[in-house]
UniProtKB/Swiss-Prot annotation:
Family: Belongs to the bacterial ribosomal protein bL32 family.
One Pfam family of this chain: Ribosomal_L32p
GO biological process, one term: translation
Region ranges (Disordered): 1-23
Name of the protein described by the UniProt record: Large ribosomal subunit protein bL32
SUPFAM superfamilies given in the database record: Zn-binding ribosomal proteins (SSF57829)
Annotated gene: rpmF
Recorded GO CC terms: large ribosomal subunit
Database matches in InterPro entries: Ribosomal_bL32, Ribosomal_bL32_bact, Ribosomal_zn-bd
Swiss-Prot/TrEMBL keywords: Ribonucleoprotein, Ribosomal protein
Record GO terms (molecular function): structural constituent of ribosome
Length: 57
């Protein structure tokens, strides 16, 4: 079995784990109704996406 030759330092471990932090979602404004929505998603309040009505709300 493979075994590490050197011990991984605390700093190196922490640097690697720093990439796994949770980030707050970024919201954008819907151009139709001005509500906050996630980017590249259908607006939940008006049902528009890329200027077209996808679902009737």
């Amino acid at each position: 079995m493979a075994v590490p030759k050197k011990r991984t330092s605390k700093t190196r471990t922490n640097r690697r784990r720093a990439q796994k932090k949770a980030r707050a979602p970024q919201f954008v404004e819907c151009p139709q109704c001005r509500e906050k929505k996630l980017p590249h998603r259908i607006c939940q309040s008006c049902g528009h996406y890329k200027g077209e009505e996808i679902i009737e709300v």
